[in-house]
Amino acid sequence: VVGESLIDIIKTISKKDWYLLMKDNSVNAYKFYNPPYEVTEGYFNSGIVHEYSSPVCSIRGIYVNILHHKITHGTIHLSTLGQHPNCNTGGFGDACPGSFEDRDICLSDPGKLLTLLEEISSTYEKIHLDSSYYKPTIPFDVKQEYKWKAS
């Protein structure tokens, strides 16, 4: 039974280029970027977006420890060239979980797991400037993203 569930997870997440990487104390869903993904955009909750003139950093990989039942500090790691502003260090470090904190990691439904993983990757492909460890000093253009509101 465990074997079938594991195969279902692997088949589902691999459709979007996620893989399982097993280590001593963790089982990580891993997304590898080749070439590394250049992070050139940051946003604030207010809707203001900074488009940087050059990459702030490049993501080589995202690791999500799926042995954690909920996302906490230490669940998401980034492998980067340079330091991602939402990560505690450059190279390889803990990503700030931000709004992902306490979200369930659902292994019983591979589709839900894949949805969460894709949400995580699209989040860290940008910079959440409201909760960054530092603000990039690279020149940027500002644009306003409009938020639709129901009337």
Per-region residue spans from a language model:
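Compact alpha/beta protein-protein interaction domains typified by the UBC
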Residues: 1-108, 113, 122
